[in-house]
């Protein structure tokens, strides 16, 4: 018996592995499996078993391609971006947003989209149209004006009607203001003539540089005059305020005020300025009432001056 060279354990395992792989490659894996299973079973039969090596691969087994790492460094999202369903939904969302913007511009500019090349309101610059809106009488006052409810949804006919309504309210305000002016001056002149010409004597109101002459002037006519004057002023100013609040005269009177227009333009950038506009309109209304009182007091000073000069 010839001596064979010594074989290491690793080499022996490799040779056995190669032999086993060669036998498996020849096929008949099922028969070999059944032979192994039936060894020593002389009494009980064992049903034939089919080896997995002889089974044909089916389409149910999905083959994975690409990155087999469970936690890859880079995620491939190209499939999600190029998915037809997602792209179609993104296109529909963008189209709906574009339609919403066009619809908004149509509402703002009376049915014409700015820059569409057609004649009319839409062909002008949007900034120029906005300045034109605020240059109209009664812009931004909030009562009896074309901007009181929703100016951007008004049609041209309705906008023209609102302009005519503002002009009519301005005319009515001027008429009532003239009526109150006539009543005030009539009441003031009647009060002055009654106290200093009818019931007063020749020195009822005389100007002099001498103190003893001024002390001879009776106090009763002047006191009664100012009492009646204060009563008439309170009644007239209260009536004017009530009528102005009911008919919206104060908002109409302040519609063309520079402060109100400046606050209207500023509120487009800072909506917080809207509350200051309400305060400004109220203060301008109070200023008009104060102007009524100051005008009547000025007339009283003029009448006293004329009487002191011409009454001697």
UniProtKB/Swiss-Prot annotation:
The keyword Transport is annotated on this UniProt entry: yes
InterPro entries noted in UniProt: GET2 (IPR014802), Get2/sif1 (IPR028143)
Record topology, Cytoplasmic segments: 1-175, 245-288
Tagged with keyword Transmembrane: yes
Cellular component, GO annotation: endoplasmic reticulum membrane; GET complex; Golgi membrane
Lumenal side: 197-224, 310-312
Keywords: Endoplasmic reticulum, ER-Golgi transport, Golgi apparatus, Membrane, Transmembrane, Transmembrane helix, Transport
Residues passing through the membrane, by range: 176-196, 225-244, 289-309
GO biological process: protein insertion into ER membrane; retrograde vesicle-mediated transport, Golgi to endoplasmic reticulum
Cell location: Endoplasmic reticulum membrane; Golgi apparatus membrane
Protein origin, superkingdom: Eukaryota
Coiled coil: none
Topology within the bilayer: Multi-pass membrane protein
Family affiliation: Belongs to the GET2 family.
Quaternary structure, from the entry: Component of the Golgi to ER traffic (GET) complex, which is composed of GET1, GET2 and GET3. Within the complex, GET1 and GET2 form a heterotetramer which is stabilized by phosphatidylinositol binding and which binds to the GET3 homodimer.
Purpose of the protein: Required for the post-translational delivery of tail-anchored (TA) proteins to the endoplasmic reticulum. Together with GET1, acts as a membrane receptor for soluble GET3, which recognizes and selectively binds the transmembrane domain of TA proteins in the cytosol. The GET complex cooperates with the HDEL receptor ERD2 to mediate the ATP-dependent retrieval of resident ER proteins that contain a C-terminal H-D-E-L retention signal from the Golgi to the ER.
Name under which the protein is recorded: Golgi to ER traffic protein 2
Biological source species: Scheffersomyces stipitis (strain ATCC 58785 / CBS 6054 / NBRC 10063 / NRRL Y-11545)
